[in-house]
Amino acid sequence: MKILHIIRSVNPEGGGPIEGVLQLSSIKRAQGHSVDILSLDSPDCESVRACELTVHAMGPGLGLYGYSNKLKPWLDAHAQDYDAFIINGIWQYHSFAAHSVLKSKNLPYYLFTHGMMDPWFKYQYPLKHLKKWLYWPWGE
């Protein structure tokens, strides 16, 4: 099986999502599967060069949201090359773009929130929660 992980960044300074991708990918590769990453990193980023997996870097993503006009066309052109898609993280452009392309092609995918829906955030950051609550119906 050929798996594509879609994530904002492969930079380990971004926290746990990339570590989760690498750990899961290690297991999947040991089982004989092929794993690539689609990210919003700049292609010349050190983290992209150092990554043990093939990284299709479509960035740099702009601002906190990470918009890149390269991500959707790349995914649209290459989606048929993969058997499974895992969107890692929410609330940013990579998840919106991946959902949009994959839904238009009627391709199923997995969404791994990496704790981003934890109720703790709702109470710890009420204004961010309100913003995300308004974004959810059309963005995710």
Protein language model features and the residues they cover:
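Structural alpha-helical scaffold elements that stabilize or flank donor/cofactor-binding regions
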Residues: 77-78, 139
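Short glycine-rich, flexible loops that bind phosphorylated cofactors or substrates
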Residues: 12, 63, 92-94
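Residues at the C-termini of beta-strands that transition into short coil/loop
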Residues: 41, 58-62, 102, 113
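An aromatic- and histidine-rich active-site surface loop
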Residues: 84-119, 136
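N-terminal subdomain of nucleotide-sugar transferases
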Residues: 1-43, 49-54, 80
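Short glycine-/acidic-enriched loop or helix-start segments at secondary-structure transitions
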Residues: 15-16, 47, 95-97, 120-123
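A short, charged, and often flexible helix/loop element on the N-terminal side
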Residues: 50-76, 84-87, 123-132
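Membrane-proximal helix-turn-helix segments that form the acceptor-binding/catalytic region
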Residues: 26, 104, 117, 129-140
